[in-house]
Amino acid sequence: MTSFEIRQMWLKFFASKNHHIAKSSSLIPRNEANLLWVNAGITPLKKYFDGTQTPPFRRITNVQKCIRTNDIKNVGKTSRHHTFFEMLGNFSIGNYFKKEAIHYAFELLTSPKWFAFPLEKLYITYFFQDQDTYQYWLDLGVEKNHLIPLKSNFWQIGPGPSGPCTEIFFDRGKTFDPRNKELIIQDLENDRFIEIWNIVFSQYNCDPKLPIEKYQELPSKNIDTGAGLERLACILQNTKTNFETDLFFPLIKALEKMTQIKYTGQESFKIIADHLKTLVFAINDGAVLTNEKRGYVLKKLLRRAANEGKKLGLDKPFLHQLVPPTAAMMKDFYKELCTNQEIIAKVLLQQENIFEQTLKTAEKTFLQHLTQNTLSGQNFFKLYDTYGIPEDLILDYAKKKNITTDYQKFQELLHDHQNLSKQNQTSQIHMNKQEESFLQFLTPSEFIGYTNFTCKTKVIKVFDKGIVLEKTPFYANMGGQIEDEGWIDNTKVTKITKLPNGQILHEVQGNFCEGQEVYACIEKTKRNQISYHHTATHLLEAVLQKQLGSHLKKQGSSVGFSSLRYDFNHFEKITPQTLLQIEKEVNQLIQKSVPVKIEQLSIPDAQKKYATLLEQNQKAKYKDKVRIVSIDTFSVDLCGGTHATNTKDLEHFTILSCESISSGIYRIEAVCNNNCQESLNAKLVPYQNDLHQLTQKAKSLQTQNLIFDVKNFPPITQSYQDILNYQKHIKAQQQALVLFEKKVLEYHQKNMVQAESNFLPPQITKKMMLTIEEEKPLEVLKFFMNHIFDKYHLEVLFLSYVQPEKIVFLCKSKTLHAGNLIKEAVSLVCGSGGGNASLAQGGTKKTKNLEQVLNFVKTKLEIN
């Protein structure tokens, strides 16, 4: 049975049991700041299990792409450790429970119509206090000696939903390990008993302060299951390990051809095949290789795979060449890999080249981290973790240079790092505690805000945190669109949130009671501006994908009344010319006055009309209808937000900025409608301030004969081009001012030298003091001091530059220590200063004490 057939059989079986088939979500979690990857089938459904949102379907099945990297060191060493894997799942949210879940698992695994596993090959574990589960399996015909009670079979990861679980193992026979079921009981690594399915009965609210027996029952009991596709394929295809299944072996065969080496189970083949799949799927979902968070994880995988390639004789970049066979291997279920394989290969080649450059300097970096011919454990780990130098390569350098390494300490640090990663992976799927009062509130509330901004309505529920109305024009903060502002009976609404069952909660000051009639009103002007910016965001996204490529995916957005923000992935720097073209194309669509079409379609109708669109989105979000927003055929998207009725409502679109917020992630800020001029002006203010300061400085430098012509900014056109023009203009003016300043300096220097007799005493001596009161740039005075010192071959020159509010002292010397002289002199008048033996500078604001300083210096220089 092929992996494609296994997936299809799983989905077909649960569809026959009235489960909704949900498309795999992206590997990059949405709205999960602390979660690096989707790492379990339940991850995208978490919001339904903890009651944050009401599920559109109570029964769901999926094949979920997952990434886990906490056991990366085991990949290639064991038969079934992977960084990328597919989890087959079936889920019940407040619908069926233990008995049905166990019956479904039994039927799918043992029925001749489905997987047809021999019953005697199955071993089942269950929570030792869960007698219901034990009895259900027994009733289905599982032998008692195949049912194993375990204290560890209880799933909990902190406060929130938790419960007992039952695990299903397949016995591959004594040829894989002579030991018996003690392998399961003692949780020993082995190739005989393969865990193929875990069913979690989520029925309690975990309270870490209490023993399990005291946990409270959940108001909504759930079923969460996961079966590893790779493990099922290994059993059903009768292969020695997962790597010989059709989920890996075509890639291994491509590696054989590339290396001219026969695969006989070598770790390098397995590591490359595993890591490459992870890289291909992650990049396809919009992940970027960076030096932080998930990007750093991918970079480590790439470098580890590249280093394994070197062990097979692949000294040049090769991973990018394996993208087509990877896409071909997975195309039956993931057609998008073939569409995007060119861009994926381009990203990989770019990163492989960067790694090659790293390796060229790796030995030098290695030598820089040695202490007395020893590499400490801390520095070993730093080279491995920070610089990305593979462990094997570090050991090779050490052996070649006869360097002692603290390998044990490195292993300890690596172990600690991996444990931390495991803790993070576990905590990442932590769920919120179910809010029972919200979950149990089922009275419907109608949102009428797409077409109505005001309404007479009544209060149907009062919570501590706010009130729910029978119907409401208020849009809650969701989907990147900010919430509405407004009033209920002249009382300001402070916050709008959506409850688990779809109603809108209005946080509002004042006393309200259930049944009370009220008048709800949103701020129309702000709502309109929000709607315009939402439509502009759709246009921007479509143009970005057209200009930069289909690999581009939204990484976050914020739609407000004064601006919009759109975050996206891209692997190259975005030029100003590209941004101007993007802005131009959005404005062209606005000027075409294209109607914004809103459709509410049933799932079957939407699948007929927009099959590709639904394929690209998570259909599990929607129950019986989907809302589709289309702007001609240029932008078609699933969206629940508010929009303009026509692109002409946007009037104009201006990009305000485009910046890299992290490696490979960019953020565009833009505005439309009457916000353009005001927002653009605000962006231009810093440049106007710079020009004002430049003008003031130019005036202070000007002389009767030297005038600096400050040029004004070019006219504003309400475009990103204005920002570029202002940047260019300021830069040109600053460069011109630098040249002018140099010219003015030369002018003053020349004049001062020509008039030197006006500043010198009648008699020139080797030790000389000068006092200058005429206003001069300090640089001119320093030039003049050097000129006089050298021209007259002086030993010491002490110059006092006297201004109304301060005095500056300069000293140049061949004999006395200039720095010490300045320090002693200014200390007499509470000044400060210093320098070296030959040149020093100081100053004071106590201008009335000049004579005290001069007398001191005269004494020091022995001047009469």
From Swiss-Prot:
GO biological process: alanyl-tRNA aminoacylation
Keywords linked to the UniProt accession: Aminoacyl-tRNA synthetase, ATP-binding, Cytoplasm, Ligase, Metal-binding, Nucleotide-binding, Protein biosynthesis, RNA-binding, tRNA-binding, Zinc
Enzyme class per UniProt: ligase
UniProt catalytic activity: tRNA(Ala) + L-alanine + ATP = L-alanyl-tRNA(Ala) + AMP + diphosphate
Compartments, as annotated in UniProt: Cytoplasm
Top-level division of the source organism's lineage: Bacteria
Short name of one Pfam family: tRNA_SAD
Annotated InterPro entries: aa-tRNA-synth_II/BPL/LPL, Ala-tRNA-lgiase_IIc, Ala-tRNA-ligase_IIc_anticod-bd, Ala-tRNA-synth_IIc_core, Ala-tRNA-synth_IIc_N, Ala-tRNA_ligase, Ala_tRNA_ligase_euk/bac, DHHA1_dom
E.C. numbers: 6.1.1.7
A GO CC term assigned to this protein in UniProt: cytosol
Cofactor: Zn(2+)
Residues noted as binding Zn(2+) in the record, renumbered to the chain: 534, 538, 639, 643
Keyword Repeat: no
Cofactor binding annotation: Binds 1 zinc ion per subunit.
Membrane-crossing segments per the record: none
GO MF term list: alanine-tRNA ligase activity; aminoacyl-tRNA deacylase activity; ATP binding; tRNA binding; zinc ion binding
Family listed: Belongs to the class-II aminoacyl-tRNA synthetase family.
Domain notes: Consists of three domains; the N-terminal catalytic domain, the editing domain and the C-terminal C-Ala domain. The editing domain removes incorrectly charged amino acids, while the C-Ala domain, along with tRNA(Ala), serves as a bridge to cooperatively bring together the editing and aminoacylation centers thus stimulating deacylation of misacylated tRNAs.
Primary role: Catalyzes the attachment of alanine to tRNA(Ala) in a two-step reaction: alanine is first activated by ATP to form Ala-AMP and then transferred to the acceptor end of tRNA(Ala). Also edits incorrectly charged Ser-tRNA(Ala) and Gly-tRNA(Ala) via its editing domain.
PANTHER family: ALANINE--TRNA LIGASE, CYTOPLASMIC, ALANYL-TRNA SYNTHETASE
Protein name, as recorded: Alanine--tRNA ligase
Species annotation: Onion yellows phytoplasma (strain OY-M)
